[in-house]
């Protein structure tokens, strides 16, 4: 099943870190180093995904190499974890639902600064290295909030597996609510501040308008990704996709559903821009750490559109005759 992905116009782009291609190569080196990729495996498919180029959108244009390298290994870990634990018709690498729950428990231990329960597991070993690198790079950041969002990410992932096993897409409303957690977008907002060195005030982060701005940005980012990933996920038996949900529950063709999702993206972007414009009048000037936080929300929005369209991550491999 393929669709013609509607073009999204997201006029929020900015210059990115110039070493994205170097970071792509580093992703391969790191994946091999932690055992998530065999030494003899062809590097070309990973390079074509462009994990380093995506990471280059999430750090400051003049950020240090160490900052870009960290964001790159984070993107690499997310991709491998997602493929091994979530994106399958039931279980992948022999992982049952119970084993995924146990994996999540083990990953939670790592995030509490405890040794990996099974250091022979490359997923655990990879996260342990990501966590060590992050805590060596960032200081005075909201670790507790990040751990909380990550545990919710894992919970949403198990919800996704339930839907896959049933073979029934969730309703659009249910999908939208859980998708924000299942994509770990809120966790990325915290990491953006940690690695790029800005610290928005708590009063700003707790403001109703800023929280809603984050929700609008998270929705746009998630839905744009759903549009581009639909064909690949459909082939893999995934049902946790807004295109699938709209098709199944609203009786539209897949193309009509994709067009509907694109329209929802456009409306969410318009609402985001409208709300952003009001922030200064609410006592939240878009300067300093606040302005940088808002900039990161937008980096995730536009880069998801740009990277998803260019990356081989969502290419569909034709079925064998």
Swiss-Prot record:
Keywords: Lyase, Magnesium, Metal-binding, Plasmid. Mg(2+) 3 binds at residues 225, 229, 233. Transmembrane segments: none annotated. Disulfide bonds: none annotated. It is an enzyme of class 4 (lyase). One of its GO terms (molecular function) is metal ion binding. Mg(2+) 1 binds at residue 82. A motif (NDxxSxxxD/E motif) lies at residues 225-233. Mg(2+) 2 binds at residue 82. Terpene synthase that catalyzes the conversion of geranylgeranyl diphosphate (GGPP) into a mixture of diterpenes, including hydropyrene (HP), hydropyrenol (HPol), isoelisabethatriene and traces of isoelisabethatriene B. Hydropyrene is the main product. Some other diterpenoids are also produced in very low quantities. This is Hydropyrene synthase.
